[in-house]
C-alpha cells in the first residue's frame, strides 16, 4: 500500500540553514491495517506524515503509494494522484471548514476532483451518515455545530474523497474525554469497513486499543517497530526514551516489580489486565 525505502529528508538543503529531519526511514503501511506513529514533538512525525500524501518529497530514497513512486525528482503532476489516494485529517481539521452548509462543505472535495454536484452531494450524504451526522445537520452552517460535530464534518470531507488510506494526525486533540472516546470508536468503525488507517499520536492507550502495528520515532529515526503487544513489553527502553507505556502495562509492570506476580507477557489494554488479574484471583482461590 505505502512503502518508504531509505527515506531521508532535509529542510533547506544545500544552504547554511540545512536541517535533516528524517534518517534512512524504512516503513510499510499494509492494506487494511491500522498503523500507529508515535513520537514527541521534534521526532519527525509531522515531516513523515507529509511524505505520506506527497506534501513533501524525500531528499533521498523513495516513497511508494500503490503504483506511484515519489522521489526527489518527481513532478507535481505525478504526485497529485497520491493526494487522492491518501487523505489526511490534520490536527484541528474543523479550522478548515468554510462552506455555507455542512453538505456543501463535505461535497467540495469530490467536486474539486471533477465529480458532478449531484454525485458529490450523494457521496457527502453517505459520509455524513458514516460519521454519525444525520440529515438534520446537513443544511446547517458548520459553524453552528459543537466542536466535536465540526470535527466530524471535517472528517466526512476527507472520507468523501474516498481515499485508500486515512491518516489521522492527533485526531482527538482538544476534545473532552467523552468526545475523545466517541471519536476513536468512530475511527475503529471506519477501519472495520476495510479502510487502511494511519494514526499519528502520543497517546499510548489508543495505540494499544486500536493499532495492529506501531512505529516509534525519535529525532528522525525509527527506534522501534512491531505489534503494540511486542513493542510495549520493552518498558524500560520506552521510559528511557520518555515515551511511556499504556496505563495497563504500567500497572502490571509495577505489580511485577513488587514480586507479587510475574506476567509471562505484560498486558497492554485494560481488558487484558482485568482478564489476567481475574484468572490470578481464581487460581489463588483454588489453591486455598
UniProtKB/Swiss-Prot annotation:
Forms a stable energy-coupling factor (ECF) transporter complex composed of 2 membrane-embedded substrate-binding proteins (S component), 2 ATP-binding proteins (A component) and 2 transmembrane proteins (T component). Its main location: membrane. Residues 2-244 form the ABC transporter domain. This is Energy-coupling factor transporter ATP-binding protein EcfA2. It comes from the Bacteria. The gene is ecfA2. GO terms for cellular component: ATP-binding cassette (ABC) transporter complex. PROSITE patterns: ABC_TRANSPORTER_1, ABC_TRANSPORTER_2, CBIO. The keyword Nucleus does not apply.
Amino acid at each position: 500500500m505505502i512503502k518508504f525505502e531509505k527515506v531521508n529528508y532535509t529542510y533547506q538543503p544545500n544552504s547554511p540553514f540545512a536541517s535533516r529531519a528524517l534518517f534512512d526511514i524504512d516503513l510499510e503501511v499494509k492494506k487494511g491495517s491500522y498503523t500507529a506513529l508515535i513520537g514527541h514533538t521534534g521526532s519527525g512525525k509531522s515531516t513523515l506524515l507529509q511524505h505520506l500524501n506527497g506534501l513533501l518529497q524525500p531528499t533521498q530514497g523513495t516513497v511508494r503509494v500503490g503504483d506511484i513512486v515519489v522521489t526527489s525528482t518527481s513532478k507535481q503532476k505525478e504526485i497529485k494522484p497520491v493526494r487522492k489516494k491518501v487523505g489526511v485529517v490534520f490536527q484541528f481539521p474543523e479550522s478548515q471548514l468554510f462552506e455555507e452548509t455542512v453538505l456543501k462543505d463535505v461535497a467540495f472535495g469530490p467536486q474539486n476532483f471533477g465529480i458532478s454536484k449531484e454525485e458529490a452531494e450523494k457521496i457527502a450524504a453517505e459520509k455524513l451518515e458514516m460519521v454519525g451526522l444525520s440529515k438534520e445537520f446537513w443544511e446547517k452552517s458548520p459553524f453552528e455545530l459543537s466542536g466535536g460535530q465540526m470535527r466530524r464534518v471535517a472528517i466526512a470531507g476527507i472520507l468523501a474523497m474516498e481515499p485508500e488510506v486515512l491518516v489521522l494526525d492527533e485526531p482527538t486533540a482538544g476534545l473532552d474525554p467523552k468526545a475523545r472516546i466517541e471519536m476513536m470508536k468512530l475511527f475503529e468503525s471506519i477501519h472495520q469497513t476495510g479502510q487502511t488507517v494511519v494514526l499519528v499520536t502520543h497517546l499510548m492507550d489508543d495505540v494499544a486499543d486500536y493499532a495492529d502495528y506501531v512505529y516509534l520515532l525519535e529525532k528522525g529515526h525509527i527506534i522501534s517497530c512491531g505489534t503494540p503487544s511486542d513493542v510495549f513489553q520493552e518498558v524500560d527502553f520506552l521510559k528511557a526514551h520518555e515515551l511511556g507505556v499504556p496505563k495497563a502495562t504500567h500497572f502490571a509492570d509495577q505489580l511485577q516489580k513488587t514480586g507479587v506476580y510475574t506476567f509471562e507477557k505484560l498486558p497492554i489494554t485494560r481488558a487484558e489486565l482485568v482478564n489476567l488479574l481475574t484468572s490470578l484471583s481464581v487460581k489463588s482461590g483454588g489453591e486455598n
